[in-house]
Design a protein with these regions (language model features):
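A generic structural signal for residues embedded in beta-strands
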Residues: 344-346
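Conserved acetyl-CoA-binding loop-helix of GNAT-fold acetyltransferases
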Residues: 119, 137, 142-158
Length: 362
């Protein structure tokens, strides 16, 4: 049995509730263009919070239309400092469109000439995959452990309740766009067929099937060398706000190079759920005891999540559990809502940054 961890549990991941609407409104107002799952629309956010609460609470079999929204709290202050989400099935009501990167070879043997050309193909390969969505963390918390818990903690939820999700997973990251909403990729490709600017088409896409894209976009491949140089360069590039969550997903083992977003050209990463680092390393463990205080400060961090869906909780604990049981500190047990004999799901937290529990730097 592993001895109790330090009492310093910095953050708590929990399901978002309707009462969290004001803070989500603030996050949505501060988020970048391209994050359509966190729109600056109070009515849409309220509806998503209600759908999420229903998804966590229902005893019905999964239908695929569920969304799950999480928030992370600073334990010391009780403040909500970030959010993330899961969509059980991309394109639940219709197809989920993106561009697939391919290379076409044209050759003339008599001339001894050949060309390998980058092309983009409109596809719906990722229809039905589980999507990671809605990531946002307060700038002051970007260098703390909060982003790690926000991103990787929801993977423990997927691992624990695998029957409610696809065996494939994807994540869209925002592409390049400036503060005014100008997007080089959209201006070069989509605007030629939609006659609207990038912010307008993003607003149009909120809560709507993307089938209208197939109705208006040509099905033939886009030859990338024919695009303006700025648009070519932007394909697969990230908006700066996407770099932190993107780096965590790539560290998890997601492939960021095959697909790009149909609107802004940002990378759409994908993977098999079972191959994700956190999922593959996760295991169930029994709470063997609860101690009032910890004996020492352990090195490293591990993710720990409760095994209940309706009141799911996840935290980062110092140290690495060994064996099949764990003695928790009283603070961690209280935050997770567990007692002796309850089951937790644990996974190592491969924190690749210099983040610590106490840093609060911009």
């Amino acid at each position: 049995m592993t001895s109790p961890e330090s009492a310093d549990v910095p953050f708590l991941l929990r399901p978002a509730q309707p009462a969290d609407l004001p803070v989500l409104e603030r996050f949505a107002a501060a988020s970048a263009y391209g994050i359509t799952t966190l729109p600056p629309d109070s009515a849409v956010l309220a509806e998503r919070l209600q759908r999420s609460a229903s998804a966590f609470a229902t005893e019905d079999a999964a239908s695929g239309e569920e969304i799950y929204l999480f928030v992370v709290e600073d334990v010391a202050s009780g403040a909500v400092v970030g959010t993330s989400g899961i969509a059980a099935s991309a394109g639940f009501a219709d197809r989920f469109y993106c561009y697939r990167n391919e290379y076409v070879v044209h050759a003339s043997p008599p001339l001894g000439a050949s060309n390998r050309t980058h092309t983009l193909h409109l596809c719906h390969d990722l229809t039905g995959v589980t999507l990671l969505t809605s990531f946002y963390v307060e700038p002051a918390y970007e260098r703390t452990l909060a982003p790690q818990l926000l991103s990787r903690g929801r993977l423990l939820f997927i691992a624990q309740f695998a029957e409610r999700f696809s065996d494939r997973i994807g994540a869209e990251s925002p592409g390049l766009a400036d503060d005014s909403g100008r997007c080089p990729f959209w201006d070069a490709v989509g605007r030629r067929y939609f006659d609207m600017d990038y912010p307008s088409v993003e607003r149009l896409a909120v809560g709507r099937s993307r089938s209208f894209i197939a109705d208006l976009m040509p099905p033939s491949p886009i030859y990338v060398p024919l695009l303006p140089e700025e648009a070519q360069w932007s394909i697969g590039q990230l908006h700066p706000v996407g770099e932190l969550p993107f780096s965590i997903l790539v560290d998890e083992g997601m492939d960021p190079d095959t697909y790009v977003d149909i609107f802004d050209g940002g990378p759409t990463a994908h993977a098999r759920v079972a191959q994700l680092k956190t999922v593959a390393a996760s295991r169930e463990i029994v709470v063997a005891g609860i101690a009032e205080s910890a004996s020492h400060r352990a090195r490293g961090w591990q993710l720990a999540a409760s095994a209940r869906r309706a009141d799911f909780r996840a935290v980062l604990l110092p140290g690495h559990a060994r064996g099949r049981s764990l003695e928790l500190g009283a603070q961690a047990a209280r935050l997770l809502g567990v007692q002796v004999g309850d089951t937790l799901r644990l996974a190592p937290a491969p924190v690749a940054t210099q983040a610590t529990a106490g840093d609060r730097h911009d």
